[in-house]
Amino acid sequence: MNEIRIRTAKPEDAAELLEIYAPYVTGTAVTYEYTVPSQEEFASRIRHTMEKYPYLVAEQNGEILGYAYAGAFHPRAAYAWDVEMSIYIKKDRKRSGIGKVLYETLEKILAEQNILNVYACIACPEKEDEYLTKDSIRFHERMGYRIVGEFRECAYKFCLLYTSDAADDL
């Protein structure tokens, strides 16, 4: 059975999720984190997120291929109806439809939670380089997101300044 299965993440998934996340930390500007978190820290992040928001994994034949989660957009009470989503897919499984299934499932759960606004903060290069392409921008546009703002040169990684685009789901 080769069907992709979406399920709720568990803190015990931390090691497998870190295998997916670590290359993004060490070799890309997709995430602005400099150091790969420990397995304990990552499990703690999963637990903390799941106190209020969904955290999903995509698996096939028992192997986790990617994950996506929502988190608070801003800590102030008036933003309680807004979330920021993040997604990470195994590098060799990108463009296989996993991201689409994860996002669609996550968005459905968020709608059931009465979340009104779904945002993504997307690292975006002025021009593509070895650390960052516009693949995430293109993915989000295909998923119906639109760029609504820009934080110019807000992040410094690999001795380069990067811009982040804010996108919302139509």
Give the ranges of each region predicted by the language model:
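Acetyl-CoA-dependent GNAT
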Residues: Y34-D92, Y103-E104, I109
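Conserved acetyl-CoA-binding loop-helix of GNAT-fold acetyltransferases
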Residues: R95-K108, K134-R138
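Conserved GNAT acetyl-CoA-binding A-motif
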Residues: L110-L132
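A short beta-loop-alpha structural element at the N-terminal edge
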Residues: R5-L17
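Helix-loop element at the rim of GNAT/NAT acetyltransferase active sites that forms part
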Residues: E19-V36, T49
